[in-house]
Amino acid sequence: MWPPSHRQLCRAFLLVCVFSVISFFLHIHQDSFPHGLGLSILCPDRRLVTPPVAIFCLPGTAMGPNASSSCPQHPASLSGTWTVYPNGRFGNQMGQYATLLALAQLNGRRAFILPAMHAALAPVFRITLPVLAPEVDSRTPWRELQLHDWMSEEYADLGDPFLKLSGFPCSWTFFHHLREQIRREFTLHDHLREEAQSVLGQLRLGRTGDRPRTFVGVHVRRGDYLQVMPQRWKGVVGDSAYLRQAMDWFRARHEAPVFVVTSNGMEWCKENIDTSQGDVTFAGDGQEATPWKDFALLTQCNHTIMTIGTFGFWAAYLAGGDTVYLANFTLPDSEFLKIFKPEAAFLPEWVGINADLSPLWTLAKP
């Protein structure tokens, strides 16, 4: 019997390699996804501003002829698939995104966002979590978990490989250990940052005409909270007395600050905020349909005054610097305190000024 030729040996070796590669991919397909789901990693096409769904790409696949980066990849040590319901408005969804990212990392799971969250956040921020396509979402055997708004021990040891989170988490206790990563995720797109900085660059102090040395962003939440807080939660929103105290706190500590006011109730602000010192400007447009314009302004300021709500929280968290917030804004017996822990909502170094609850005591009298 003739010994095999060199050519035959090469062919045999190539066949073995081909079968090995096929076997490897079949193994990944069977172990990584539930029955019927595809093999590809899902990622958004970042060339689009608001892609409605994910595109499919393999690790290392370029996103386009002009793309310099590849599809975001989860580390090989991560497994499973976690996502979160995109409930609520802009600030709510920022909290859900950050909490999903943090809890998934803590539990060694891969995090994906749903298309609605991508549509809300991607036009504003350079977020990197890949998008879960609707057909994958509908065929995944999810277990659902509603989160409360503070970190708990059980959240550090969740064994479910396919988990869909819900609720309105926006507590620093979930993600503050990843602060720099969260700040990178919520980096503004260049055109929004530049537009906000252009607005701030044109501001002048009213009395002297000088450029301000310090910018203090002021977010005044009104709108639906005017009814929700007193009627449902036995609470108040920030009033003119609170805003005056907060501004005086900054005036005492910073030379020549300017207060950049944004609000979804700008008319009230113009009628009730004292502008006699020439250091207040009403810069926001207050349009709830385009919240990123006001948000970009706030994040480009040095410091923050917030009233209540997740929008103000995130503006302060990303701006850094000093933050003054409205404290004790509900009655002690409010049901709100069952779902909201102030110590988990506001960073320890932030400064709280107590709300005036006298309007609530008046309402409570028979």
From Swiss-Prot:
It comes from the Eukaryota. Residues 1-8 are cytoplasmic. Glycans are attached at N66, N302, N328. GO terms for cellular component: Golgi cisterna membrane. It is found in: Golgi apparatus, Golgi stack membrane. It catalyses: a beta-D-galactosyl-(1->4)-N-acetyl-beta-D-glucosaminyl derivative + GDP-beta-L-fucose = an alpha-L-Fuc-(1->2)-beta-D-Gal-(1->4)-beta-D-GlcNAc derivative + GDP + H(+); a ganglioside GA1 + GDP-beta-L-fucose = a ganglioside Fuc-GA1 + GDP + H(+); a beta-D-Gal-(1->3)-beta-D-GlcNAc-(1->3)-beta-D-Gal-(1->4)-beta-D-Glc-(1<->1')-Cer(d18:1(4E)) + GDP-beta-L-fucose = alpha-L-fucosyl-(1->2)- beta-D-galactosyl-(1->3)-N-acetyl-beta-D-glucosaminyl-(1->3)-beta-D-galactosyl-(1->4)-beta-D-glucosyl-(1<->1')-N-acylsphing-4-enine + GDP + H(+); a neolactoside nLc4Cer(d18:1(4E)) + GDP-beta-L-fucose = a neolactoside IV(2)-alpha-Fuc-nLc4Cer(d18:1(4E)) + GDP + H(+). Residues 26-366 are lumenal. Its EC number is 2.4.1.69, 2.4.1.344. Keywords: Glycoprotein, Glycosyltransferase, Golgi apparatus, Lipid metabolism, Membrane, Signal-anchor, Transferase, Transmembrane, Transmembrane helix. InterPro entries: Glyco_trans_11. GO terms for biological process: carbohydrate metabolic process; fucosylation; lipid metabolic process; olfactory bulb development; positive regulation of cell-matrix adhesion; positive regulation of endothelial cell migration; positive regulation of endothelial cell-matrix adhesion via fibronectin; positive regulation of sprouting angiogenesis. It is a single-pass type II membrane protein. GO terms for molecular function: alpha-(1,2)-fucosyltransferase activity; galactoside 2-alpha-L-fucosyltransferase activity. Pathway: Protein modification; protein glycosylation. Its main location: Golgi. The chain crosses the membrane at residues 9-25. PANTHER family: GALACTOSIDE 2-L-FUCOSYLTRANSFERASE, GALACTOSIDE ALPHA-(1,2)-FUCOSYLTRANSFERASE 1. Belongs to the glycosyltransferase 11 family. Catalyzes the transfer of L-fucose, from a guanosine diphosphate-beta-L-fucose, to the terminal galactose residue of glycoconjugates through an alpha(1,2) linkage leading to H antigen synthesis that is an intermediate substrate in the synthesis of ABO blood group antigens. H antigen is essential for maturation of the glomerular layer of the main olfactory bulb, in cell migration and early cell-cell contacts during tumor associated angiogenesis. Preferentially fucosylates soluble lactose and to a lesser extent fucosylates glycolipids gangliosides GA1 and GM1a. This is Galactoside alpha-(1,2)-fucosyltransferase 1. It comes from Gorilla gorilla gorilla.
